[in-house]
């Protein structure tokens, strides 16, 4: 489950009961069943931030949740968070605890971007091994609350975007 800093903030403030996806993910959503887990990744910070358990089949709802108006994330699931970390507690994908253990990163140099396809689209299925490993380290991180300091660029990326409409 991909979150931008903006959708992370919206989900965090919404009661954390609904996860939403764009209409073009409906086919993938149809394969998700109650009991499945969504491993959450924050774009712009490149961090693993959570584990959500799905508690419903998908449904379509146009009521804004993630954006104040014209919310594009209308393909939705009811979820319950098993892990939901603050950005500075999220595990950077480039940290060895993640990088050296995932099938799509472990054989790559850290400056290689070939892995990004695995996290570019929401509802991309991870291997069972990668999913179980990420769930385990995220649960451990929920307990330990180790800090992964944010860089200046990370802090800038977390700030809400302001669009000048004049």
Description of each model-found segment:
Residues 1-34, 42-43, 140-165:
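Compositionally biased, charged N-terminal/linker segments
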Residues 32-36, 102-103:
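Short, compositionally biased strand/turn segments
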